[in-house]
């Protein structure tokens, strides 16, 4: 029912400021999750189980991080048929993010530009929200660093967040690829990444001993990487036996949106323009890591055919975000059906 109504809903939302519409959507999803309305209105999505990172996913189509940064709408989102939900990015301390306006729609390109800057309520509130959710499916918790933490001390923020979210996560995503936190992408460099992953894996083992369970770690990387950088990241993932990698985050490239309204706004570009670049990174990663490291493919999925292409490039699972904003819950069911 809601799928047929979504074009009308979207038309109203797209008349609003992009971030205001985002917050309204979250409020609606939160209310729908509390009342059970989301499940009643959402399309029925068939099961298509996958086992990845030692976890069994109801289906291979997940929600990417960024939509629900504080984990406040997990139940409403889960009712829409996703095989897994990822929330965050969360940082140790609450922070407001970058000044508004900081989110821009580019409908002619099926794209969004954002420079949100990890705005979130902090990891303590995040954990409370996660604990309050009734959802018991696969839940990824995405962690980052505070904007005012020097890049040389970034590992401290990641380790602090990992310690706090570990007991409540099905897997934890380490986000080092947002373009909206100054110098964050430096952590993708060979030396910086090696040190960070070593520290995280050491912490993971100690937490596994403490809690009696090993929670997989996934690294989220950028699409703006050359072959040498991808090989270096792949080697580091293999060396530290990281359980997964998410490819990719938003792009800094503006080639596909040059001359469009908002096309020159600063921030990360998501949606259809990142599809090919994301798939290229996935293919190169798969060639480097073989079948050892599962890849979660994200970037520009707007149809079931797009989801199949992402899997054909080498992904084990896929995630939606911008396509979900433009197409609504029907996209979830379409992608699951295409991947059965």
UniProtKB/Swiss-Prot annotation:
Substrate binds at residues 69, 114-118, 175, 180, 249-250. Pathway: Pyrimidine metabolism; UMP biosynthesis via de novo pathway; orotate from (S)-dihydroorotate (quinone route): step 1/1. FMN binds at residues 65-69, 89, 142, 175, 220, 248, 271, 300, 321-322. It is found in: Cell membrane. It is an enzyme of class 1 (oxidoreductase). GO terms for molecular function: dihydroorotate dehydrogenase (quinone) activity. Binds 1 FMN per subunit. Monomer. Belongs to the dihydroorotate dehydrogenase family. Type 2 subfamily. This is Dihydroorotate dehydrogenase (quinone). It comes from Paraburkholderia xenovorans (strain LB400).
């Amino acid at each position: 029912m809601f799928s047929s109504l979504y074009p009308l809903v979207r038309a109203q939302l797209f008349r609003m400021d992009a971030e205001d519409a985002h917050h309204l959507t979250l409020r609606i999803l939160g209310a729908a999750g509390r009342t059970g309305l989301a499940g009643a209105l959402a399309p029925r999505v068939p099961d298509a189980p996958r086992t990845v990172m030692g976890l069994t996913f109801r289906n291979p189509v997940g929600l990417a991080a960024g939509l629900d940064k504080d984990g406040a709408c997990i139940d409403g989102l889960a009712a829409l048929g996703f095989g897994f939900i990822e929330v965050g990015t969360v940082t140790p301390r609450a922070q407001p993010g970058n000044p508004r306006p900081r989110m821009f729609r580019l409908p002619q390109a099926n794209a969004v530009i954002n420079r949100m800057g990890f705005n979130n309520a902090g990891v303590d509130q995040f954990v409370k929200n996660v604990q309050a959710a009734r959802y018991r499916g696969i839940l990824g918790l995405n962690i980052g660093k505070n904007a005012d933490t020097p890049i040389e001390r970034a590992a401290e923020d990641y380790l602090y967040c990992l310690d706090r979210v570990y007991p409540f996560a099905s897997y934890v995503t380490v986000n080092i690829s947002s373009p909206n936190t100054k110098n964050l992408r430096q952590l993708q460099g060979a030396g910086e990444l090696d040190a960070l992953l070593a520290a995280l894996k050491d912490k993971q083992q100690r937490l596994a001993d403490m809690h009696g369970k090993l929670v997989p770690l996934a690294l989220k990387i950028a699409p703006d990487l050359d072959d040498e950088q991808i090989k270096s990241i792949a080697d580091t993932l293999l060396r530290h036996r990281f359980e997964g990698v998410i490819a990719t985050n938003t792009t800094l490239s503006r080639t596909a949106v040059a001359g469009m309204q908002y096309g020159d706004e600063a921030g990360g570009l998501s949606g259809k323009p990142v599809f090919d670049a994301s798939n290229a990174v996935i293919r190169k990663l798969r060639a480097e890591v073989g079948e050892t490291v599962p890849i979660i493919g994200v970037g520009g999925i707007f149809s079931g055919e797009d989801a199949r292409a992402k899997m054909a490039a080498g992904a084990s699972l896929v995630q939606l975000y911008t396509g979900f904003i433009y197409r609504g819950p029907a996209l979830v069911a379409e992608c699951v059906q295409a991947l059965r």
